[in-house]
């Protein structure tokens, strides 16, 4: 056990020792704080202004939809024009729009909706940009895939810590200050990334002019279809946990359940990224999604609070490994010159899926209770597995003109031949 633990730590330390790695990872996480905290910050601000929960939910939904639309569009612009020219202006515009919302309040509904929508639309695609940078920073395929797992784990930590930071800002100052401070900090994070040498040097490979961009890849479309349902599973758990918590201790239990879900993903991602995996990534993803779906099923037992927390940890274990493995497949299937856009589409699809899952689980819980609410994630997980099974051939074969990790996508000289292929180890 001690040897395995040392191997886990050593694998991640090797990544963090690489030049610029810590700066890029931390800068990206800080830069994404506004996105990770937007929903709760908007709700708390609207309520403090005297607005209704319906208005708060509607504004948060507008932010989410605008963000889902903006990520792939901005990702395509990054591929065309480079990271600094797109990421920093987008971050500034997003922060300014949120500042307009913070100072104008909800008195003029139209202005509030426009400001929140603009903030979501211009959220910079830092997540996709970081994944495009890892090959040029690390160079070795195994390290790139470990970095993807570390990246997935870091995102789980951020989305767990982010809401806590909002509550701290609100308790120290006000909901308005929380909006302003977190978005200002987000701009600093984006600035830290785009002025770094890897970000300034990165150039996308030449791309074929096509209005579909990354979506012309059948393999990427199959992956997006599968992750739409994985997002639905995650979103439905957050809703189904509410009535369960109401019957077993209230808000404190709900907080423990959400923390347990994040803890499971953190542990699973850390262990997954610490070893080298042989075989086809597509086949491994099918196995991981199958395990993810199976681990959702015990939630329907709805035992006491302590046991339920443990089951929720189990439910989260395979989430980060699924995401990390999907990153590898995005590398394989993204058409040349579209890597940032392709990663942004994965983020968008997962986010949209979570929103759909939240919306679907609401009526299910209302009519059938928490039991049927917890049936939704298991069902969504198995539908995701079905999508992967039906598209196995497409996912197993890289698309024509696809870019793999550490290919010319990250070569300033735009060499034609990639340095290695994802087909042997991932």
Could you describe each region identified by the protein language model?
Residues 7-66, 214-259:
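Helix-loop boundary and gating motifs at the non-cytosolic
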Residues 29, 109-126, 228, 308-321:
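Hydrophobic core of transmembrane alpha-helices in multi-pass small-molecule transporters
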Residues 70-83, 170, 267-281, 365:
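Helix-to-loop junctions at the C-terminal end of transmembrane segments
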Residues 92-107, 291-303:
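C-terminal ends and interior cores of transmembrane alpha-helices
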Residues 115-157:
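Cytoplasmic helix-loop-helix junction between adjacent transmembrane helices
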Residues 124-138, 241, 321-334:
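Intracellular juxtamembrane helix-capping segments at the cytosolic ends
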Residues 282-326:
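C-terminal transmembrane helical hairpin of 12-TM major facilitator-type secondary transporters
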Residues 337-370:
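A late C-terminal transmembrane helix in Major Facilitator Superfamily
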């Amino acid at each position: 056990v001690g040897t395995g633990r040392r191997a886990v730590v050593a694998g991640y330390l090797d990544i963090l020792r690489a030049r610029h790695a810590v700066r890029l990872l931390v800068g990206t996480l800080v830069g994404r704080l506004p996105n990770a905290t937007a929903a709760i910050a908007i709700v708390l601000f609207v309520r403090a202004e005297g607005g209704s929960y319906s208005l708060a939910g509607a504004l948060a939904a507008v932010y989410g939809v605008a963000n889902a639309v903006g990520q792939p569009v901005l990702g395509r612009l990054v591929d065309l024009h480079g990271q600094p020219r797109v990421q920093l202006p987008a971050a500034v515009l997003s922060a300014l729009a949120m500042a307009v919302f913070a100072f104008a309040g909800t008195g003029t509904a139209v202005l509030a909706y426009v400001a929140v929508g603009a903030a979501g639309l211009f959220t910079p695609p830092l997540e996709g940009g970081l994944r495009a940078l890892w090959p040029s920073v690390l160079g070795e395929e195994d390290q790139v895939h470990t970095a993807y797992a570390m990246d997935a784990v870091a995102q789980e930590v951020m989305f767990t810590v982010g809401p806590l930071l909002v509550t701290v800002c609100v308790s120290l100052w006000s909901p308005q200050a929380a909006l302003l401070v977190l978005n200002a900090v987000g701009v600093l994070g984006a600035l830290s990334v785009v002025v770094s040498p890897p970000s300034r040097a990165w150039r996308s490979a030449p791309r074929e002019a096509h209005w579909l961009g990354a979506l012309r890849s059948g393999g990427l479309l199959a992956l997006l279809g599968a992750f739409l349902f994985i997002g639905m599973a995650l979103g439905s758990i957050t809703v189904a946990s509410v009535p369960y918590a109401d019957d077993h201790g209230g808000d404190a239990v709900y907080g423990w359940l959400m923390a347990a879900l994040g803890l499971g993903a953190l542990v699973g991602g850390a262990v997954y990224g610490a070893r080298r995996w042989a075989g086809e990534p597509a086949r491994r993803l099918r196995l991981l999604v199958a395990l993810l779906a199976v681990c959702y099923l015990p939630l329907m037992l709805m035992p006491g609070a302590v046991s339920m927390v443990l089951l929720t940890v189990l439910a989260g274990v395979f989430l980060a490994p699924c995401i990390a493995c999907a990153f590898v497949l995005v590398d394989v299937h993204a058409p040349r010159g579209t890597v940032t856009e392709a990663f942004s589409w994965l983020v968008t699809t997962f986010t949209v899926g979570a929103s759909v899952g939240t919306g679907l689980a609401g009526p299910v819980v209302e009519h059938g209770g928490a039991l049927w609410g917890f049936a939704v994630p298991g069902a969504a997980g198995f539908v995701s597995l079905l999508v992967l099974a039906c598209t196995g051939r497409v996912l197993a074969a890289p698309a024509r003109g696809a870019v793999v990790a550490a290919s010319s996508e990250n070569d300033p000289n735009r060499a034609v031949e990639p340095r290695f292929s994802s087909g042997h180890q991932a």
